[in-house]
């Protein structure tokens, strides 16, 4: 029987009142623990207060500043329990972008309530605008998407949310070493899709959830050891930083049943490093999108047999189409379209153009890739990321991976830099290890031993950090096309 979130949380609290539901950390990093009884009571109180603050005759949504804190976790759960659409907001969102998001939400729902640190809902004063859209299907939650290319869109997930033992978590997550009641660590921010949905799945499946308020690689390793974490979701950026730790001991990960990585393309060195650390049977990769058009899954042993793949469709059909909308043969790159039965898990944008869809129900978020003869998907860079050097196409990921292989380099981003003759050349923003020093000519020579000549960066800029989203996705749009600081390589 499908249960409401409120009923499910209450049932767990009745059955296991003293078991730990959540572990968080205060601003002083002191441990904060809530039992299931304490968590259920606080969720019920906050849900009641939220519903009391709303005009139930009007459509409304709740916005929760979603740092990885106990109040944020309670606020999200309370909105779901109250069956009020909830939007987890990055607390560091600039005011102009935040106001734009509020206007989008107001356009869909009419009223927006922001929950403060005490979980008190405050109505957002929206400037006069168009009347709210006509009533639509019920919404469980809303998530920001597309931040790697500018101001995010908002994707709405149909609701209300229900707990169904057969469908919680989803079938694909159940294939990744997941067990009900396990100990789970949330590393990524709750306002991002993968950590948010992992939190909801863990909540409904009675897990003990540890919330890491910010990523620090040594701390992540310590939390895994201290709490005997069994299931962990990471991004490739997290994985690279952890692998760089000195004296990394595989014994510290003995409790882990599985690591699932998502959110961005993972370079081969990082993937092999984690397979070496845990063994191939404990490393999983999931490719999907906030919009829920479909997913692929690959385990480490499959990846070793087909390096670079993100797996085969899981309850998902995949079709690769060219620019004219025609299917292409295996091995040929094109736009990735996916289809799931009855639009399972599909979300749609709030006040945005609908997701691009074919007449027979295949949908795309614009990613590019190719299929091999076995149906395994390999992602390619999107057209706007590819660097065109005199007609030769350069995959920025390949350049970045070559630079990260240098012992002085922590991170790098490759971008197109205008060139009078070639149209563009490769430029890079490079982050060095603390205390490291390296000449641009040395980095260029290092790349020259790994890359074709036209792929070698011609301009270098040394920076303290490169712009990434909370999920670790590179935000190339934040990088200026022209490099400064005398950054041209000799």
Where are the language model's segments positioned?
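Conserved AMP-binding/adenylate-forming core of the ANL superfamily
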Residues: 21-56, 94, 98
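Conserved ATP/PPi-binding loop(s) of AMP-dependent carboxylate-activating enzymes
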Residues: 312-313, 326-357, 392-394
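Conserved AMP-binding/adenylate-forming
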Residues: 32, 48-93, 393
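Flexible, low-complexity linker/hinge segments
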Residues: 1-4, 116-139, 164-166
């Amino acid at each position: 029987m499908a249960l409401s979130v409120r009923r499910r949380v209450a049932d767990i609290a009745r059955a296991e009142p003293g078991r730990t539901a959540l572990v968080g950390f205060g601003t002083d990093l002191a441990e904060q623990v809530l039992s299931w009884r304490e968590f259920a009571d606080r969720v019920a109180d906050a849900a009641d207060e939220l519903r009391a603050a709303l005009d139930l005759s009007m459509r409304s949504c709740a916005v929760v500043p979603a740092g990885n804190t106990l109040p944020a976790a309670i606020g999200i759960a309370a909105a779901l329990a109250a069956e009020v659409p909830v939007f987890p907001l990055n607390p560091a969102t600039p005011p102009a972008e935040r106001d734009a998001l509020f206007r989008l939400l107001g356009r869909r729902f009419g009223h927006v309530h922001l929950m403060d640190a005490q979980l008190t809902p405050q109505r957002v004063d929206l400037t006069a605008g168009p009347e709210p859209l006509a009533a639509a299907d019920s919404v469980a939650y809303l998530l920001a998407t597309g931040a790697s290319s500018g101001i995010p869109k908002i994707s709405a997930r149909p609701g209300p949310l229900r707990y169904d033992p057969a469908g919680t978590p989803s079938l694909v997550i159940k294939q990744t070493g997941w067990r009900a009641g396990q100990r789970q660590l949330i590393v990524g921010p709750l306002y991002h899709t993968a950590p948010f949905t992992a939190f909801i799945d863990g909540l409904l499946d009675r897990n003990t959830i540890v919330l890491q308020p910010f990523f620090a690689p040594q701390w992540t390793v310590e939390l895994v050891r201290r709490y005997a974490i069994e299931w962990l979701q990471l991004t490739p950026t997290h994985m690279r930083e952890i692998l760089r730790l000195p004296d990394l001991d595989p014994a510290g990960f003995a409790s882990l049943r599985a690591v699932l990585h998502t959110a961005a393309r993972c370079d081969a060195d990082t993937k092999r490093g984690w397979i070496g650390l845990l063994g191939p049977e404990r490393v999983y990769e999931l490719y999907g999108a906030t919009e829920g058009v479909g997913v692929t899954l690959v385990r480490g042993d499959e990846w070793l047999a087909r390096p670079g793949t993100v797996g085969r469709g899981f309850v998902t059909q995949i079709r690769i189409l060219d620019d004219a909308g025609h299917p292409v043969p295996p091995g040929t790159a094109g736009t990735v379209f996916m289809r799931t039965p009855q639009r399972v898990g599909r979300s749609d944008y709030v006040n945005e153009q609908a997701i691009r869809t074919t007449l027979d129900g295949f949908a795309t978020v614009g990613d590019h890739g190719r299929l091999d003869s076995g149906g395994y998907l390999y992602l390619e860079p999107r057209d706007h990321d590819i660097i065109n050097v005199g007609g030769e196409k350069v995959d920025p990921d390949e350049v970045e991976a070559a630079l990260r292989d240098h012992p002085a380099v922590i991170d790098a981003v490759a971008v197109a830099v205008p060139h009078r003759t070639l149209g563009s050349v490769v430029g890079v923003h490079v982050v060095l290890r603390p205390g490291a020093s390296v000449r641009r000519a040395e980095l260029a020579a290092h790349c020259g031993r790994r890359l074709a000549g036209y792929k070698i960066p011609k301009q270098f800029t040394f920076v303290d950090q490169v712009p990434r989203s909370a999920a670790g996705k590179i935000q190339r749009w934040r990088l200026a096309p022209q490099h400064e600081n005398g950054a041209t390589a000799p």
